[in-house]
């Protein structure tokens, strides 16, 4: 047994020297090929250069099938194959083994976000609805907010105000709620690097804000302007009552304060901050679902988040296109993506830029929302 450990450690060192920036994917018949292929693609999309497919015994056929699938889809190419025949004391027998070394294909794009988690609205005679009249799953919808943290005004922020007010919500109170939450988030996280920032909750929120069941906020310190931490901040509120279209599955609002193009001299800086905001958005969504998994009796999981083009239209930089903004949003979401806690992402229609951005940045197929 000790000799086996030493041999494995020596082999790992050889692999690391010959194939830097590599990951070993253990292939087992307990996992489906679809799961293994998705994992391999996520690793490649995340920056891994080499995937080492490793299987023993009855997993060998699956290992070869996985290699064939990745190669046929221009995800990775085979650079080396090793076979082995090892004796295992545990079952007193020899077991065949296989290692297939694959390098990322030069044309591979991919995304850390599983394609099945992404859907796109098609063009209709009117805007994509903020909420569905008959939702079949728990959904939050994204509101492109303002640095002053109010719900109202023009664009989708005004549409949120009109819709929520029509269902007897006290919309004017959201501004004070968000400002209190932002202050708490800054007090607890304002001096931390972004990777150490935590989402903060408003304790007993329904006592002061009776429409709200849960409220949380996560800031992005790298985007603060002077003492103002609002840019890049993300708020999630779930409703306690007065649900849109009187449907409990229209569960809440995600309020995102994206950067405004007029505040940036460089279009590159603007798009970088859109991407950072989107990364913070995804992290906050995952934080929420992670929280409710621990407290599922009190709160429900967010199955889907409907996402509009924040920092787009009149708020984008004059030298940026809507497609540029959509790409920055998708790239940021991919950076923050965690497969377990992430909700599915449903993108609102806006000149088809989200679907175009997905195809251009990932090379992956799209799923039609209307066929879900």
UniProtKB/Swiss-Prot annotation:
One of its GO terms (cellular component) is nucleus. Keywords: Chromosome, Cytoplasm, DNA-binding, Nucleus, RNA-binding, Telomere. It is found in: Nucleus; Chromosome, Telomere; Cytoplasm. GO terms for molecular function: DNA binding; RNA binding. Identified in a TARE6-associated complex consisting of over 30 proteins and including ALBA1, ALBA2 and ALBA4; the complex binds to the non-coding subtelomeric repeat region TARE6. This is DNA/RNA-binding protein ALBA4. CDD domains: MAF1-ALBA4_C (cd21101). The gene is ALBA4. Its main location: nucleus. Belongs to the histone-like Alba family. The keyword Isomerase does not apply. InterPro entries: Alba-like_dom_sf. Possesses DNA- and RNA-binding activities. Binds to DNA fragments longer than 14 base pairs with relaxed sequence specificity. Associates with the subtelomeric TARE6 repeats. Regulates the abundance of transcript sub-populations in a stage-specific manner. Regulates activation of male gametocytes. Participates in the coordination of sporozoite development in the oocyst. It comes from the Eukaryota. It comes from Plasmodium falciparum (isolate 3D7).
């Amino acid at each position: 047994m000790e000799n086996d450990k030493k041999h494995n450690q020596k082999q790992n060192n050889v692999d690391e020297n010959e194939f830097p920036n590599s990951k070993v994917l253990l292939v087992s018949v307990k996992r489906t090929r679809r799961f293994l292929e998705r994992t391999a693609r996520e690793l490649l999309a995340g920056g891994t250069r080499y995937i080492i497919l490793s299987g023993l015994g009855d997993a060998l056929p699956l290992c070869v099938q996985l290699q064939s699938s990745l190669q046929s889809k221009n995800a990775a190419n085979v650079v080396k194959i090793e076979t082995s025949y090892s004796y295992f004391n545990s079952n007193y027998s020899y077991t065949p083994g296989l290692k297939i070394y694959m390098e990322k294909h030069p044309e591979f794009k991919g995304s850390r976000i599983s394609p099945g988690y992404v859907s796109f609205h098609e063009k209709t005679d009117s805007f994509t609805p903020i909420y569905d009249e008959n939702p079949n799953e728990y959904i939050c919808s994204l509101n492109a907010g303002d640095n002053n943290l109010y719900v109202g005004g023009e664009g989708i922020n005004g549409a949120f105000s009109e819709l929520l007010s029509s269902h007897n919500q006290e919309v004017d109170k959201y501004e004070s709620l968000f400002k209190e939450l932002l202050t708490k988030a800054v007090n607890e996280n304002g001096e931390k690097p972004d990777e150490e920032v935590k989402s903060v909750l408003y304790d007993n929120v329904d006592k002061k804000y009776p429409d709200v069941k849960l409220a949380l906020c996560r800031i992005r310190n790298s985007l603060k302007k002077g003492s103002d931490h609002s840019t890049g901040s993300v708020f999630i509120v779930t409703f306690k009552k007065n649900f849109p279209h009187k449907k409990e599955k229209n569960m809440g609002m995600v309020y995102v304060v994206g950067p405004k193009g007029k505040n940036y001299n460089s279009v590159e800086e603007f798009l970088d901050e859109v991407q950072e905001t989107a990364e913070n958005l995804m992290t906050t969504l995952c934080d929420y679902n992670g929280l409710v998994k621990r407290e599922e009796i009190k709160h429900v999981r967010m199955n889907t988040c409907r996402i509009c083009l924040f920092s787009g239209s009149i708020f984008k930089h004059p030298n940026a296109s809507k497609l540029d903004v959509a790409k920055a949003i998708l790239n940021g979401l991919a950076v923050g993506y965690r497969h377990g806690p992430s909700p599915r992402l449903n993108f609102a229609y806006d000149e088809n830029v989200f679907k175009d951005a997905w195809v251009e940045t990932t090379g992956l197929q799209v799923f039609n929302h209307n066929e879900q």
